[in-house]
Amino acid sequence: MRRCLWILFFPLMAQAAGEGTWQASSIGVTLSNRGVAMSSRPLAPSEAVSGQMTLVAWNYRLIGPTPAGLIARLCSQTRCTQVDAESGTTQAFSGVSADEPLRFIWEVPGGGRLIPALKVQSNAVIVNYR
């Protein structure tokens, strides 16, 4: 019985310790030219939060093939980290204010038209903070 009570109260204790999570998502972008960087919409908490980011999980979905040389970065206002897969986690934003928005930056190096265009269906993050 005590074990069950512990499980029930654990989320409340974590919240009391100042830990939390926020998530945000947006529709993606279409990148038609090489050598041009394009940003997603800002991904920000829907309500006021305070604390420092600890772990950030990301996910994005592409429509069509991944262009050779694609560089995808996840950025705060003060730092960026390259993301090498459509989903994953990073601690690169540890210490960044939890209320700071994040955004994806998309780029395919080179010059000229990108055929087919890079089409990002969606971008999403889950931000853990303390």
List each language-model region with its residue ranges.
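Sec-dependent N-terminal signal peptides
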Residues: R3-M13
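Short, intrinsically disordered low-complexity segments
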Residues: M1-R2, A72
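Disulfide-rich extracellular domains of secreted proteins
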Residues: A16-R130
